[in-house]
């Protein structure tokens, strides 16, 4: 039995060092296509964001344990409440000062969010001193305009719960390549 315990400890140490990396920061990617369609994707530590939205007065560990153990229907209700609050706090202004309508919101599924909370809860019991390394979750939205000049400059307003966020924006260059033909010069 002692031999197996030693192997487990060694394998755990290897796995921990192999997965050690810098903490991923919250970030947003804005992609403008055809001058009229803007896609927004937010990559966030969703369990921490939910904690700040739903119960900032509680310790994170308590919040995680409580929500990880909730019945799925109850958790779904809490999650929808948080999504409404976050969605109302996310805004985008155009260069002319008008607000852009953000539509087609896509949020992480309740089952995946609760699974992430359950994983974090298990880690807090098994290895409380270790930092959680789960993947960030995505929140998506779209904006569109019939006027190509509307999206030349935009300003984002983000909820405080997102913390500091790195924003990457770009307008991809797209070309079609016919079968068997070489592409035109691709510039970077």
Residue ranges of each PLM-predicted region?
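Intrinsically disordered, low-complexity segments enriched in polar/charged small residues
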Residues: 11-12, 26
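N-terminal soluble domains immediately following signal/targeting peptides that reside
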Residues: 21-188
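Sec-dependent signal peptide recognition
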Residues: 2-11
């Amino acid at each position: 039995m002692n031999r197996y315990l030693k192997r487990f400890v060694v394998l755990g140490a290897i796995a921990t060092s192999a997965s050690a990396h810098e903490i991923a920061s919250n970030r947003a990617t804005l992609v403008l296509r055809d001058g009229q369609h803007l896609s927004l994707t937010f990559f966030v530590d969703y369990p921490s964001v939910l904690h700040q939205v739903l119960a900032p007065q509680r310790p994170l560990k308590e919040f995680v344990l409580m929500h990880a153990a909730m019945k799925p229907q109850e958790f779904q209700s809490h999650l929808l409440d948080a999504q409404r609050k976050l969605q109302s706090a996310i805004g985008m202004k155009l260069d002319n000062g008008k607000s852009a309508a953000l539509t087609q919101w896509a949020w992480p599924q309740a089952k995946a969010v609760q699974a992430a909370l359950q994983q974090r809860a298990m880690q807090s019991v098994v290895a409380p001193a270790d930092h959680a390394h789960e993947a960030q979750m995505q929140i998506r939205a779209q904006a569109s305009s019939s006027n190509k000049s509307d999206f030349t400059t935009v300003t984002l307003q983000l909820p405080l719960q997102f913390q500091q966020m790195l924003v990457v924006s770009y307008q991809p260059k797209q070309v079609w390549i016919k079968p068997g033909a070489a592409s035109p010069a691709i510039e970077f």
